[in-house]
Amino acid sequence: MTRTASLSRRQLLRGATVIAVGGASALLTACGESALTAEDGSTPSPSPAAPTSAPATAAAATQAPTPPTASPTPPTATRVDMLPRATVAPTTPAPTAAPTTPPATPAPSPTATPIQAADVVLADGAITLPGSVVARREPRLIAPESHHRGQIEIWRSGGWQTNFDLSVVSYGEILSGGVPRDGIPPIDAPTFVAAPEADAWLDDREPVVVFGANGETRAYPLQILTWHEIANDVVGGRPVAVTFCPLCNSALVFDREVLGATMRFGVSGNLRNSDLIMWDDLTETWWQQLTGEGIVGDLAGYFLDPLPSQLIGYGEFKASFPNGMVLGRDTGFRRDYGRNPYPGYDAARGSPFLFRGELDDRLRSGERVVAIEIGGEAVAYAFTHLQSVGVVNDVVGGLPVVVFWSPETASALDARAIADAKAVGSGVAFGREVAGRTLTFEPGDGAFTDRETGSTWSIAGEAVAGALEGIQLPPVVHANHFWFAWAAFYPETRLVK
């Protein structure tokens, strides 16, 4: 089987026949206790605040280049008892570079018809990369420089079958996080418990990632995700990857169905701009976690489908979703769940850990923001601003949105015990159009009110009282990032502070 590593970029784009590319080995089990548990069974405590010693859990935090610019479909309000699926997230992400159709080898006649970029079959036929995507990424591909060849050979000798001839980023931007592939093991067989059982070890202020699909809603505590960074799950029949990069405070959910195949995602052990770089088990493409773009490998230039989620306090999750389930501690790994392996990290000053980019001085690098990108427009809402106003009504990419503020959510990166951490708050975003009417929200005592009907809304975006009771605002894809991380990949972002 021929790998694309032996093919030039021009061959990939001009091939009149489908190109078959060998698939990567399916690594369906995580690397046990690698790098996180000592031989005697103890769990060392990494310390990101001390960059002289790479933390064992500084596994990767990766961000993807500019996300798709397709205009979202306006959300429609529905009566539901769970978080609805995304109605505003782009369903067919694509890079922002203008699509082109590369011509064939120079033709003798000016009337010759250019050869269209061929579809590319990957992973032993499991995935077909559309020719349109192949064509779009061509102008963005970056050939490895000679001084990067040595590092590429080290990766290959370590077992990587990634197609390193295809990259949309410079290899000089990729740094080792100090652990091998899946040295921070993802959770591949998650188990869930009801709230009464989770109450024994999960404080109401602790942050949880909330995701729902097809009648199921689940919470993923950061006290667990901090140690694993990825949970490969199936929610309501939908395969998803719930991801968290502690170094960037970025919690995002992605669809694991990619071009018709279901992928398992792992932690590459590498970072770019301090952000986690994930990998998939079918093509071994490397993916930027913060934006979901394939940056190295056969699927470089392709974007994962992001799904809307919320980062809120566990108590708020229970109040909004009384039947929701919680990711349990029975993960198959021995970890000191509840203990923060990055104590004091979010209070650190200066350049973030393993960050080599330029810092945007519009905010302190470690300040949190609610970040949204819709229709090519990126916006960040500073936590300090949200704390002072309680709610923000805005329009992003032509879509009316609202950002709700919750003040009590604890930091997962402050005190050694997350339950004892300071409150940093959290922000959630929704579309604010209901039945063709744009609502305007105001903060209240633990809830929110719209001016148009006087209905009361919860932090989860559900009307709990008033004329619109039972209506759920459609969520938008957003996250609570550290400012430096968001600004590194969206330098033109509009900042609301």
Where are these regions (language model features)?
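Mid-to-C-terminal functional-domain signal that highlights helix-capping/loop sites
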Residues: 114-497
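Secondary-structure transition/capping residues
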Residues: 23-27, 36-38, 328, 497
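Short, intrinsically disordered low-complexity segments
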Residues: 2, 8-9, 13, 78, ...
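Residue-level detector of alpha-helical recognition elements and their boundaries
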Residues: 27-28, 62, 260, 332
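N-terminal secretory signal peptides
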Residues: 1-11, 15-31
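Ser/Thr-rich, Proline-interspersed low-complexity disordered segments
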Residues: 35-145
